[in-house]
A protein has these predicted regions:
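A conserved regulatory-domain signal marking ACT and ACT-like small-molecule sensing domains
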Residues: 2-13, 36-37, 41-140
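Charge-rich, low-complexity segments
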Residues: 1-32
Length: 140
C-alpha cells in the first residue's frame, strides 16, 4: 500500500530542521487541509507544534497574563469575547502555566470582531486577575 492511498485517522512525516527557516510541507498534507495557508503554533509546555488551516493570512494573537485566577475568570472572559464578536477562535490554550506564570492565549481572525481592538483590550485590562494584555498581528 502506498502512502497516498492510506486513509487512516492521522498522517505523519519526519521534518528536518536546518539553519534556514524553510520546512518542506508535503503536498498531500496541504491538499488534506484544503487551503494553501495555515497557522503554526508552538505550545511551549508540550513542545508540540500544531498547524491550523486558514482562509486568510489575517491572524491576531491575544495573550493574557493572569496574576490571580478567580473561579469565574473563564465565565467573565467568555462574556467579554461574546460581546466583542470573538466566538470562533482558531486556537486557544485555555488557562495554562509556563513555569510559575499563568496565561490564557488565543489566535483569531480579526474580521469577526464586532467592536474595535481598543474596546476589547480595555475590557480585558479590567478583568479581575489580568496583569497584562498583549494583542498583536501574527507575522507571515
Amino acid at each position: 500500500m502506498s502512502d497516498d492511498s492510506y486513509e487512516g485517522a492521522t498522517a505523519g512525516r519526519v521534518l528536518l530542521f536546518n539553519e534556514g527557516e524553510s520546512v518542506k510541507f508535503p503536498t498531500s498534507f496541504k491538499n488534506a487541509m484544503g487551503t494553501d495557508r495555515g497557522l503554526m503554533v508552538l505550545v511551549h509546555k508540550d513542545r508540540l507544534i500544531k498547524i491550523f488551516p486558514l482562509d486568510s493570512e489575517e491572524v491576531l494573537f491575544l495573550s493574557l497574563e493572569i496574576g490571580k485566577l478567580s473561579n469565574d475568570f473563564l465565565t467573565k472572559l467568555s462574556q467579554i469575547f461574546k460581546r466583542a464578536g470573538l466566538v470562533d477562535l482558531l486556537f486557544s490554550t485555555g488557562v495554562c502555566l509556563r513555569g510559575t506564570r499563568c496565561f490564557y492565549e488565543c489566535y483569531f481572525n480579526p474580521t469577526q470582531l464586532s467592536s474595535d481592538l481598543g474596546e476589547l483590550e480595555s475590557s480585558l485590562n479590567v478583568l479581575d486577575g489580568v496583569q497584562r494584555v498583549l494583542i498583536k498581528k501574527v507575522e507571515v
